[in-house]
Amino acid sequence: MCLIWGLFSVIIASVAQLSLGFAASHLPPMTHLWDFIAALLAFGLDARILLLGLLGYLLSVFCWYKTLHKLALSKAYALLSMSYVLVWIASMVLPGWEGTFSLKALLGVACIMSGLMLIFLPTTKQRY
């Protein structure tokens, strides 16, 4: 069950990151503070997505807290790297996002997935 909480945390954090990225690209820049505040107070789609992203991070922290009660920190922390993979894939697949495929990024994803497999594969104890 602890791994399930960890996966929930990763998925929710990935969705939250995508939501915040969407909101940041559609809201006025914070350098124009009054325009930014006005957009937040209007509570349009962009502001609602920003709020959902922030709430998503809060929910992700709760799931992370539940994960750390049962799963070793070394494994739990490594699990968070899956978020990078999910966000990269989602940015290429979802309409409106401008994620680009590159061999460098694919190599990075392969390294992350290889590391996760090394950490999470069951080990066999050798008898001497």
Curated annotation (Swiss-Prot):
Protein's gene: arnF
KW Transport (keyword) present: yes
Periplasmic-facing ranges: 24-35, 98-100
Gene Ontology molecular-function annotations: carbohydrate derivative transmembrane transporter activity
Top-rank lineage group of the source organism: Bacteria
Gene Ontology annotations for the cellular component aspect, listed alphabetically: plasma membrane
Cross-referenced InterPro entries: Flippase_ArnF (IPR022832), Small_drug/metabolite_transptr (IPR000390)
Transmembrane regions listed in the UniProt entry: 3-23, 36-56, 77-97, 101-121
UniProt keyword list: Cell inner membrane, Cell membrane, Lipid A biosynthesis, Lipid biosynthesis, Lipid metabolism, Lipopolysaccharide biosynthesis, Membrane, Transmembrane, Transmembrane helix, Transport
Cytoplasmic side: 1-2, 57-76, 122-128
Subunit structure, interactors included: Heterodimer of ArnE and ArnF.
Recorded topology in the membrane: Multi-pass membrane protein
Family annotation (HAMAP family): Flippase_ArnF (MF_00538)
Name under which the protein is recorded: Probable 4-amino-4-deoxy-L-arabinose-phosphoundecaprenol flippase subunit ArnF
PANTHER family the UniProt entry points to: 4-AMINO-4-DEOXY-L-ARABINOSE-PHOSPHOUNDECAPRENOL FLIPPASE SUBUNIT ARNF-RELATED (PTHR30561:SF9), SMR FAMILY PROTON-DEPENDENT DRUG EFFLUX TRANSPORTER SUGE (PTHR30561)
Family the UniProt entry places it in: Belongs to the ArnF family.
Pathway per the UniProt entry: Bacterial outer membrane biogenesis; lipopolysaccharide biosynthesis
Reported function: Translocates 4-amino-4-deoxy-L-arabinose-phosphoundecaprenol (alpha-L-Ara4N-phosphoundecaprenol) from the cytoplasmic to the periplasmic side of the inner membrane.
GO biological process terms on file: lipid A biosynthetic process; lipopolysaccharide biosynthetic process
Subcellular location: Cell inner membrane
